[in-house]
Amino acid sequence: GVTLQRSRYDEPYQWDDDAPAEKKMFRTPNTYGYFTATYTPIKPLTIALSGTYTGSMLVQRAAISAENAAMGEMPERPAVALMTPDFFDLGIKAAYDFKFCKSTVFQLNAGIQNIFQAYQKDFDRGANRDSNYIYGPATPRSFFAGVKISY
């Protein structure tokens, strides 16, 4: 599926006293898409591929005052609205079914989520960080394995 949109305020939105007002809505990419594909090369083996594309979007980054910068790990900076990079999050899963008796299936599966390590690179750190400055996929590349029993 694909979503193409353009989200704007009727009047510019003043989100911070020191930052310019914005007509673009925050955290709403103009382009978003996803897909899933499943391939079964032999009856007990299934391979699934899934992906999500999130286009660039406008996000708010709060100011850090000189006083707060002196107490934490982040440098002083003004409030600013930034365009994020776009992200493509791809995952793969392989599953193999072992049949026991007539109605019992034991499945082994494994896979990788976020294969390309599409992940925010500029997190704020420390006690005075902007905890709302988060965008993009929620987890870095991860590996998983599982067992499923159906009866």
PLM features: residue spans?
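Gram-negative outer-membrane beta-barrel transporters
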Residues: 1-66, 119
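Outer-membrane beta-barrel transmembrane domain signature
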Residues: 79-89, 101, 151
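Residues embedded in well-ordered secondary-structure elements
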Residues: 26, 38, 81-83, 99, ...
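Charged, glycine/proline-rich intrinsically disordered loops and linkers
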Residues: 67-75
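Residues that define the transmembrane beta-barrel architecture of outer-membrane proteins
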Residues: 29-33, 86-90, 104, 139-143
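Extracellular loop and loop/strand-boundary signature of outer-membrane beta-barrel proteins
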Residues: 15-24, 77-82, 130-135
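C-terminal beta-signal and adjacent terminal beta-strands/loops
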Residues: 44, 53-67, 96-151
